[in-house]
UniProtKB/Swiss-Prot annotation:
Stretches the record annotates as Disordered: 454-483, 514-546
Modification sites for Phosphoserine: S291, S460, S493
Assembly description: Oligomer. Interacts with HCK (via SH3 domain).
Region (Interaction with HCK): 533-538
Residues where N-acetylmethionine is found: M1
Listed Polar residues bias regions: 473-482, 527-539
Protein name according to UniProt: WD repeat and coiled-coil-containing protein
Stored InterPro entries: WDCP (IPR028041)
Compositionally skewed regions (Low complexity) per UniProt: 458-472
Residue runs in coiled coils: 549-577
Highest taxon listed in the record's lineage: Eukaryota
Positions of modified residues (Phosphothreonine): T524
UniProt entry keywords in alphabetical sequence: Acetylation, Coiled coil, Phosphoprotein, Repeat, WD repeat
Length: 663
């Protein structure tokens, strides 16, 4: 569905966040108008209906619906302007069923510009949260009065985004690289900091956040470019195990969280000493030199696994905070995120990249299960899940003239349209379902167990499983033996064919066709409260986890290998067709150029003298013809009686306009 041209923010925007209402449909803006479009689902397909303009304004940055309280209660729509938020009430008109009326109920003004995602509704009540770069305010009764609850941020950092947990009891605010957690008292209409974890450091700038549970949020962090040049050499690099191997060996630390004093909240960064990389020489192994296509283990040159942006699940418990991290390949600033509770899917995208990645938010693993590719000149300006199968995407397309130059403002002109993409059949969070198993049974039957083990060993020889999560306990100072420092325990997973984080390598080190991350099975960590299975069930579960994802990986890998083989054959053909000329450097006694002198007997003026370079000791007559503007050039073959002492040779050439010779 085409929405037309609009003026939208270039970054940090999710125009479809809280934009769908079950009764009133989809609310959207083109920068000046606020439009409602009917949206209905029939047989698993989205159908767009008529559109109605409810208002025209000087500037509109975004719109979002308040949660549905009761069927007959009026719907509240927050319209975000630059420094103003107006709340409108929509209800059916008494004149007729097809009539409706909209009226403004309240208005919120801020001294600073409101963030692109600066309006966040409470999931259960008509409580509006307004974000600026330096503050957060809560309006408990925004549709009745303008009473404000100021959030005590207690820091000078920049606010990027915020969200409520699904139960509405916790507000999580992302400030720079920290998560600030607050508890909401709905009866007293007050907010206070979390007692056990008021500030949780992530060590990377947080660009987007979305609630995934009653006590869990998903955050997306950007690529920390400023930290790649300030890694600690002692923590990043390990020496070679023997003298024969000169390649770089690094410690497989995939996830690292800055140590935190739970009492004082002071963050101690381990990145202080600069790393000198000038002495490092990379020597490929013999297997890599002989193989046509070589799949290597992840390059741990950056030491801490911070060579890409990350998707992190943070769970707030009463006495524990758990994080799970997975890399986001190819997206530097992931400022778009959406979540579907039924399918446990997380969609991650960026306003500056044409790729949308779908991850499974299952407790045991977070594999990248699908990638949506837009056109090269298209950018996602909003994403949201309509159902567990359908993802609604607002696609913005810039003019070629605007895309060719650096942006001069925070806003740009886009041609916006809506598209719906269906999730893949294998996108269920349960990797052991019967449907997933049957979908790849034919392919798996072709592989014996020995072949699968051999293929797995060839992909990652000697590799150990990477961390799937971090366990941070408040009473860890007594366990670690260090006062004031928290214990960071790596949660190991069983051996698997491919690690989700090791396969998801940065696109700077990989060809584009190998960018999608391959799914990997994983087992629930031991610290979780999962009921213990008996031995036969555990064996069957392990077999299913080994077979289904491995067949999926092999199928994707086979397609990539076929495509790579085609590219290599085309490249070989180009090399054979190319005519290679290895010109020999002329001897010092031979001049690589000649002097051409042209004399016209009909003209009284001076002769023309030009120096012309020779190509392999030859000069084309057509070049001479074009140089002097002749219609015809004829070469006379003569027998030279003698050669001058200076080894110069004279050739007489006759043309229709006179005589010229080369010396």
């Amino acid at each position: 569905m085409e929405l037309g041209n609009g003026k939208l923010p270039r970054t940090g925007l999710n125009s479809l966040n809280q934009a769908v209402h079950p009764t009133w449909g989809l609310a959207w803006t083109d920068g000046n108008r606020v439009v409602l479009t009917d949206l209905q689902l029939h047989s698993g397909e989205a159908k767009f209906g008529d559109s109605r303009v409810i208002g025209r304004f000087e500037s509109v940055c975004g719109v979002c619906w308040a949660p549905v309280r009761t069927v007959r209660s009026p719907a509240l729509l927050a319209i975000q302007h630059r420094k103003l938020v107006s709340v409108w009430q929509l209800c059916p008109s008494t004149a007729g069923a097809s009539k409706w009326q909209a009226s403004q109920t309240s208005e919120v003004r801020e001294s600073l510009p409101i963030l692109p995602r600066g309006c966040v509704w409470h999931p259960k009540d008509a409580v509006l949260t307004v974000l600026t770069a330096q503050g957060v305010s809560i309006f408990p009764n925004v549709h009745q009065d303008g009473s404000r609850v100021k959030v005590d941020v207690n820091t000078k950092g920049r606010v990027y985004c915020a969200c409520w947990t699904l139960d509405g009891q916790r507000l999580v605010v992302a400030i720079d690289s920290n998560l600030h957690s607050y508890i909401w008292d709905s009866s007293q209409k007050s907010l206070h900091s979390c007692s056990f974890c008021p500030v949780f450091p992530v060590n990377c700038s947080i660009r987007s956040i979305e609630a995934t549970g009653n006590s869990q949020v998903a955050i997306a962090t950007e690529l920390p470019l400023h930290k790649l040049c300030s890694l600690n050499a002692s923590e990043a690099l390990d020496g070679p195990p023997n003298g024969d191997d000169g390649s770089v060996h690094t410690r497989p630390v995939d996830e690292q969280v800055a140590t935190m004093d739970m009492n004082s909240g002071v963050t101690v960064s381990p990145f202080s000493v600069p790393l000198d990389l000038t002495h490092i020489h990379f020597n490929p192994s013999q297997a890599e030199q002989s193989s046509l296509i070589c799949l290597r283990k992840k390059d741990y040159l950056t030491g801490t696994g911070q060579d890409s942006s990350h998707l992190i699940l943070v769970t707030f418990k009463k006495a524990i905070t758990i994080t799970k991290k997975v890399a986001i390949p190819g997206i530097l600033v992931p400022d778009l995120i959406a979540f579907n509770l039924t399918a446990e899917l997380v969609a991650v995208a960026s306003n500056t990249c044409n790729v949308i990645l779908i991850y499974s938010a299952a407790p045991s693993s977070m594999p990248n299960i699908q990638q949506i590719q837009l056109e090269s000149n298209e950018r996602p300006k909003g994403i949201c899940f309509l159902t567990d199968r359908l993802l609604l995407i607002a696609v913005g397309k810039q003019k070629p003239s605007e895309a060719a130059f650096l942006p001069s403002s925070e806003y740009g002109q886009y041609t916006v349209r809506l598209i719906v993409r269906e999730m893949a059949q294998g996108s269920e969070s349960s990797g052991t379902s019967a449907e997933s198993q049957g979908a790849y049974s034919d392919f798996t039957a072709l592989l014996s167990k020995a072949d699968r083990e051999k293929f797995t060993d060839s992909l990652s020889p000697g590799s150990s499983p990477l961390s799937q999560g971090l366990l941070l306990t408040p009473n860890s100072s007594t366990q670690s033996g260090r006062s004031g420092r928290a214990l960071i325990q790596e949660i190991k997973s069983p051996l698997s064919p491919l690690s989700s984080d090791s396969v998801v390598h940065e696109t700077l080190h990989r060809p584009p066709w190998l960018c999608p991350a391959l799914p990997r099975p994983s087992r629930t960590p031991e610290h979780t409260s999962t009921p213990e299975l008996n031995s036969p069930q555990r064996e069957n579960l392990q077999k299913e986890k080994e077979t289904c994802p491995l067949s999926r990986e092999l199928e994707i890998l086979s397609r990539h290998l076929v495509a790579m083989q085609q590219y290599l054959s085309e490249l070989t053909g180009f090399l054979h067709k190319e005519k290679r000329v290895a010109p020999a450097y002329p001897p010092s006694q031979d001049a690589p150029y000649v002097h051409l002198i042209y004399q016209n007997p009909c003209s009284v003026g001076p002769t023309e003298r030009r120096a012309v370079l020779l190509c392999d000791g030859k000069l084309r007559l057509s070049t001479v013809q074009q140089m002097f503007g002749l219609h015809l050039v004829e070469m006379l073959h003569e027998v030279l009686s003698s050669i001058p002492s200076n080894h110069m040779v004279t050739h007489n050439l006759h043309g229709p306009g006179g005589l010229f010779w080369s010396v």
